[in-house]
């Protein structure tokens, strides 16, 4: 049943005009600032009685339930397509939690919400909101996900020390060597083979092990807990809680060892920062968990989806073989094109009344951003459902935007380039071993991707 819509308010300053900056709550005037919720912003000097009033924000729409069903292959979510077209700022209810939330789907609106300080992640902590899963993946009291500047800036600065250009240059040869070894193993196993088993599954974990400092013998345990940590089914609550506890214990043990070993991996960076009082032990563990999720499970599925996209677009695959210098640009377009997750991620709370896309979002309202819909917004990406390596605009939102833009993006790009480049070099005749519709994809998870990817050559 639709919930009662929130009452319309007096009009507010337009959020996306040069006259009313989105990052402040006052309208410019000559003299003192005027309140944010006035009927009009003076264009110059003093307001004229003839100045027309801006349109009233539209009444709040009814609340719609979004079950976030599994989708075939790389199909975009039809619910998001509908909202982006007809109701770009909508009210929704998700499978878990309480209440309703706003869902923002258009590219410019998503960029606005993710960069405006009036939308807070920190205020989500401890609040019951409608959500995608029964328990949070990350700690709501530590780490980067649920904090705002200036605390977020302090934590991000620590983690950024591990994501320098120098560290990526050190890591890339190791990644290239690991990819070559894995593909040699696939060649020895013979065709047909499962590319997820031989490359996309073990490769990100191997790179993560080198980057974070995970021992070889612990790799499979880390993979298993990563899968459970991101499960989203109704029956997955206890399994996810157990995985969260096991992950935190494993990482805490790794950080304790790093305090004595003084190694230059991410665990060493975090352990030193905690020992010197820059961050707490809980923050160090939560930061490492964030890297595990983005650097292991997410890369596995996203890179597998990229390869599936190429294998189902043979002309694009052939072009990459002929023009390998195109690979970095192709990877950016694949990040935009591939629906990397189901549903939405971490919400924000409006700290004051803000107008977005013609809707008045009240202080205290919950707001989600649909990055998937933004990446298929035809206003930003003409012919958005086409895979186009020559696209002029490549500023996708697959890694988010604003202060919470994914720190691991530089590593994810490197890994995608290494994997795709290695496959094209080692198996120039690679193709799917089954019809595209027979490729099995993950079910009931937050991150979308192939479960298996049968190939031959």
Predicted region positions:
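Low-complexity tandem-repeat tracts in intrinsically disordered regions
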Residues: 24, 31-34
